[in-house]
Design a protein with these regions (language model features):
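Tubulin/FtsZ superfamily GTPase core signature
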Residues: 1-253
């Protein structure tokens, strides 16, 4: 729902959940209730997995009718539904030859060993069924905003998930008068790339390019990950029409 409220253009949303109440209050118009009971998975992974498998034909039908070429699968890892439904849905999308990107959050260490173990097992399964996987460490995000009240820090973690999805989606959907990046470019970089990392930052004023490049390497999205061994890098700069990139800034990039 956070991503829907963010209003990313050119993206269609589908909400999947075992919990009828959660789906009813979700603002997304396209919804699939996983399974038939509608009572939630109760933090029981096997129940969430069975529910997702039971609803695969509904999801397949929607993906075919939507005509999409790229699928983002977002979920919070460690619970009962998203943890096990995400790999199941990802496998379906990959089998349908869609560029499949997983963007998930890992639980806080303080949430307990059982939840952490469930999350790590699910992330490993998801990685086998997507082209690219971004894992956002909630501990890193909360640590970056440790001066905020706890509920606001968790809200920022949700914002990071939305920002990561928006960042990739807008590379494909946003038009550019300079060097255009289209779906084929994104597919070439992300197809079967495995674990990926992403950073989204902003800057303004003097030396804005230098500022944004340095800030990108310190983003909560990256945590402590090194990108020196990356095989491919996809860069996208968005600037207002009134203050477009200068020639020297393009050379600097």
């Amino acid at each position: 729902s956070n991503m829907w409220h963010a209003g990313v253009k050119g993206v269609t949303y589908m909400a999947c959940n075992t919990d009828r109440k959660s789906l009813n209050i979700n603002p997304v118009s396209n919804k699939v209730r996983l399974g038939t009971e509608g009572l939630g998975a109760g933090n029981r992974p096997e129940r969430g997995r069975d529910a997702a498998i039971a609803s695969l034909e509904d999801i397949r039908r929607y993906l075919m009718e939507s005509g999409c070429r790229m699928v983002f699968i977002t979920a919070g890892m460690g619970g009962g539904t998203g943890t096990v439904a995400a790999p199941v849905i990802a496998k379906l999308a990959k089998e349908m030859e869609m560029l499949t990107v997983g963007i998930v959050t890992s639980p806080l260490v303080s949430e307990g060993k059982r939840r952490w173990k469930q999350a790590m097992e699910a992330i490993a399964q998801l990685e086998q069924n997507v082209d690219a996987l971004l894992v956002i460490d909630n501990d890193n995000v909360v640590r970056a905003y440790d001066d905020l009240p706890l509920h606001e820090a968790f809200s920022r973690a949700d914002d990071v998930l939305s920002t990561a999805t928006r960042g990739i989606a807008e590379i494909v959907t946003r038009e550019s008068d300079l060097v255009g990046v289209d779906f084929a470019d994104v597919a070439e970089v992300m197809r079967n790339c495995g674990r990926a990392h992403m950073s989204v930052t902003s800057a303004c004023g003097e030396n804005r390019v230098d500022k944004v490049l340095k800030a990108s390497l310190c983003s909560p999205l990256l945590g402590h990950q090194e990108i020196t061994g990356a095989k491919n890098i996809l860069l996208n700069f968005s600037v207002p029409d009134s203050d477009e990139l200068k020639t020297r800034e393009v050379k600097q990039v």
